[in-house]
């Protein structure tokens, strides 16, 4: 009976280990899902403001050529007011998809908040940034010419690390945001 009891004890121990392993795996999956939700914009599927802030909080000096671009959708308030918030949401999703389709997978594309988006292009130069922005504009025009009622229009500003002696992503972000705001004001003046 002692051998039988220890065999039963072993079986119970094995079952306990299996149950604990399954529970740990479920918990790890749930934690990963919670982390994804914490850093992912539910509407667009892009990294959200928290993910953007986490990248910006890295205060390391940038060692390889990096660019930061800030986009702000134009007329989102007008679309929300005249066509409804669901139309505004569709415009945001459409623009997010456009950004993700144009910018290389290696680069960061996030929704900073509301109608603002942030892109970080790694290992780049000015010529590549210009080329990507030109491609974005062409793709935007194609989308807008398909007869879609929701026309994409945006202001953007960008900064690149090679223009600064020592830069962090936060420095690039602040400069890009400032240039974006200047471009937005210039567009408003031209449209008056």
Please give the residue ranges for each predicted region:
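A short pre-motif secondary-structure segment
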Residues: 108-111
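Membrane-interface helix-start motif
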Residues: 1-6
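Juxtamembrane or sensor-core-proximal signal-transducing alpha helices
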Residues: 10-35
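Active-site-proximal alpha-helical element of nucleotidyl cyclase-like catalytic domains
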Residues: 87-106
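Short helix/loop segment flanking the catalytic signature motif in cyclic-nucleotide metabolism enzymes
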Residues: 91, 118-136
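PAS and PAS-like sensory/regulatory domains
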Residues: 150-155
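Conserved nucleotide-binding and Mg2+-coordinating catalytic segments in signaling enzymes
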Residues: 32-54, 71-85, 93
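Catalytic-core segments of nucleotide cyclases and related cyclic-nucleotide turnover enzymes
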Residues: 81, 85, 130-137, 141-147, ...
């Amino acid at each position: 009976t002692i051998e039988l009891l220890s065999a039963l004890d072993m079986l119970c121990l094995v079952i306990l280990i299996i149950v604990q392993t399954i529970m740990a795996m479920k918990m790890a999956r749930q934690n990963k899902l919670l982390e994804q939700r914490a850093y992912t914009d539910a509407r667009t599927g892009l990294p959200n403001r928290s993910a953007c802030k986490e990248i910006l909080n890295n205060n390391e000096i940038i060692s390889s050529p990096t660019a930061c671009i800030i986009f702000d959708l134009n007329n989102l308030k007008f679309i929300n007011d005249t066509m409804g918030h669901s139309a505004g949401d569709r415009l945001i999703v459409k623009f997010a998809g456009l950004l993700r389709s144009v910018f290389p997978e290696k680069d960061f594309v996030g929704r900073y908040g509301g109608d603002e988006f942030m892109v970080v292009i790694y290992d780049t130069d000015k010529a590549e940034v210009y080329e990507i922005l030109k491609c974005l504009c062409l793709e935007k025009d194609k989308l807008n010419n398909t007869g879609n009622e929701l026309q994409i229009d945006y202001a953007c500003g960008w900064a690149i690390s090679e223009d600064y002696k020592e830069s962090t992503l936060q420095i690039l972000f602040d400069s890009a945001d400032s240039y974006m705001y200047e471009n937005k004001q210039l567009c408003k003046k031209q449209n008056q």
